Curated annotation (Swiss-Prot):
Binding, Mg(2+): 129, 197
Keyword Zinc: no
Cross-link (Glycyl lysine isopeptide (Lys-Gly) (interchain with G-Cter in SUMO2)): 279
Subcellular location: Cytoplasm, Perinuclear region; Golgi apparatus; Nucleus
One GO cellular component term noted in the UniProt record for this chain: Golgi apparatus
Keywords: Cytoplasm, Developmental protein, Differentiation, DNA-binding, Golgi apparatus, Isopeptide bond, Magnesium, Metal-binding, Nucleus, Spermatogenesis, Ubl conjugation
Pfam families, sorted: Translin
Functional summary from the UniProt entry: Acts in combination with TSN as an endonuclease involved in the activation of the RNA-induced silencing complex (RISC). Possible role in spermatogenesis.
Annotated segments matching region Disordered: 1-32
PTM field: Sumoylated with SUMO1.
The name this protein goes by in its record: Translin-associated protein X
GO-annotated biological processes: cell differentiation; spermatogenesis
């Protein structure tokens, strides 16, 4: 083998032996062939799926933003003179969030939700957090996943507003009913985030001189923590990660209750929040060392 031919000389000579009409680069592509038509249909299907995914991501972002605004509104209850006005306004905001979820349900009509779950999971978790926060303020209890899903049944008659009477799958096809089911993982992650909002509500209540709310929140968080402890590391990875944050929130609430119970009689109410915040910083430092 000469130096000019190099290591690829044999391959080049072998390629030159092919007739010109059999070379790949010289062959015209028939755009109307069955293979090309099949791949064009695949391209259209993938483009439509990607476009749908992007629309769902935008809707999920809107759901997240509106749900956060509802949570911020509900935090004003600790200092507002009339709680009913804020609850009414929060219900209006949640109705707006459900209108966005109705659009998601329409986008997912006839589709496998699990293929697009990653696009909407953030918004659903934030919605669960907002609606469960409102439910706790009203009833001092935890809303169930079934109750949340019942609120996510929509019909064309009321233009997407919640339907109080759940319908069967046959009725869904007959009357044009859409529904979106919150998955157990979305529900658990939303409830885990709820504990952080309850911790903030507890600290704000202490600062406003409310000595009942911290103990109610503390008892509720203990029950939630016990429930998550049963799941432990056997559940989804995201749930086990939230367990540490939940434990921190519970410790801060219990510390606020300690400040109220032990030192409440000797410290003015307007200073209790400062005492609890100092204790909270000490807890964070100890957990960081450990």
């Amino acid at each position: 083998m000469s130096n000019k031919e190099g290591s690829g000389g044999f391959r080049k000579r072998k390629h030159d032996n092919f007739p010109h009409n059999q070379r790949r680069e010289g062959k015209d592509v028939n755009s109307s062939s069955p293979v090309m038509l099949a791949f064009k249909s695949f391209q259209q299907e993938l483009d439509a799926r990607h476009d749908k995914y992007e629309r769902l991501v935008k809707l999920s972002r809107d759901i997240t933003v509106e749900s956060k605004r509802t949570i911020f509104l509900l935090h004003r209850i600790t200092s507002a003179p009339d709680m009913e006005d804020i609850l009414t306004e929060s219900e209006i905001k949640l109705d707006g969030v459900r209108q966005k979820i109705f659009q998601v349900a329409q986008e997912l009509s006839g589709e496998d939700m699990h293929q697009f779950h990653r696009a909407i999971t953030t918004g659903l978790q934030e919605y669960v957090e907002a609606v469960s926060f409102q439910h706790f303020i009203k009833t001092r209890s935890l809303i169930s996943m079934d109750e949340i899903n019942k609120q996510l049944i929509f019909t064309t008659d009321d233009n997407g507003k919640e339907n109080k009477t759940p319908s069967s799958d046959t009725q869904d096809e007959q009357f044009g009913t859409w529904r979106l089911r919150v998955t157990p993982v979305d529900y658990l992650l939303g409830v885990a985030d709820l504990t952080g909002e309850l911790m903030r509500m507890c600290i704000n209540s202490v600062g406003n001189g409310d000595i009942d709310t911290p103990f109610e929140v503390s008892q509720f968080l203990r029950q939630v923590y016990d429930g998550f402890s049963f799941i432990g590391n056997t559940g989804p990875y995201e749930v086990s990660k939230k367990l540490y944050t939940l434990k921190q929130s519970l410790a801060k609430v219990e510390n606020a209750c300690y400040a109220l119970k032990v030192r409440g009689s000797e410290i003015p109410k307007h200073m209790l929040a400062d005492v609890s915040s100092v204790k909270t910083e000490m807890i964070d430092q100890e957990e960081g060392i450990s």
